[in-house]
Amino acid sequence: MLSFNKFRPQGVVANLFNQTRPTLIAPDTFISTRSYSIFQKTLDDPLRTSPTCFAGKTVLVTGANTGLGFEAALKSFGLHAKHVILGVRDVEKGEQAKQRILQTMPQIPLSLSETTRDGNPTSQRISVRKLDMSDYDSIHNFVNELAAKDGPLDVAILNAGVFGVKYEPLSKYGWENDLQVNVLSTALLSLLLLHAKAIKPKTGVLEFVASRRMRTVRLTEEEKNAPSLLEVFNRKQEKFDASRQYQVSKLLLVAFYKSLATRSANLVQGSPIITAVCPGFCQSNLSRGHQGFAADVLRAVLNTFVLRRTEEGARTLVTGTIPEEERHGRFWYDDELHDVMLPDNVGDTQQFANKILQDVITAIQCDTSVPVV
């Protein structure tokens, strides 16, 4: 039987990888079997669109003015959400994103049978809120405003993240940028949302956007035995490995999430569903720091032949928010639900996760108040 996928550009590349696989993933080469399988899955399987409807629901998306966050916000609006909140660092860019959503879907009603509810015009169904993930005060203010103005959320998609090209000057709190935004600030935001009861219990969903490639991280014995992995990867490296730093930040985030999900009942009575998703290899603006002709050419090739479209990657962010109890503490990717699997060499995974959670909370407490789990 002919496979339609073979006639897609991605399918052609997949077939080429099938033919050359023994060479590409031979022992001691830079492409691991696990990396290959993730890459192959991205090439072969388009993701399904969301089977859910957000009618009557309030949805928060952070990092929502561009990339995956924008597409997730657009989809939420298109699924008839009562209220979509865009959490953005730059309010002006957030307002521009809001206008793009309204222009793209000007006639989307609140539900399949009505065009307004409570007399609210369509434009009032999207709010833009300032959220600077490098500033703890901004995160506190953001959550306080949510709790005061919006009532409990039905869905919170914690998408905001960075991928540093080089070792950035330390944040105001003394942390490398990937660690600050992807780990510490995201952790603080999640804890404050839970503590403020800003997400509906039991049926609400708190979603972390992660990366399953964090499983490819191989910690050295020195790193594993260090008092704090945060401190280890906060040091200025002689040769900064941007890709490894990003994956380490996602490893720490997933470890934090894994521990948080097991303890969430201690934080608020009737916890929301806490889950994590991975959109796979897809086009986004995370690589915007890579500049120059070579970077532009590589980006064009990857975008054309390899990566999922941003819209397709955002489908995972939306389908991951289906409020099912079995999603709590698990990992959604490629339209399937998986157990959270950390790298093989971290030892006892729950013990590792619990230690990371405590390290993260300790680091945040040096600079701001944070709920204790």
Question: Model-derived features: where do they sit?
Answer:
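C-terminal helix/juxtamembrane-tail motif
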Residues: 355-373
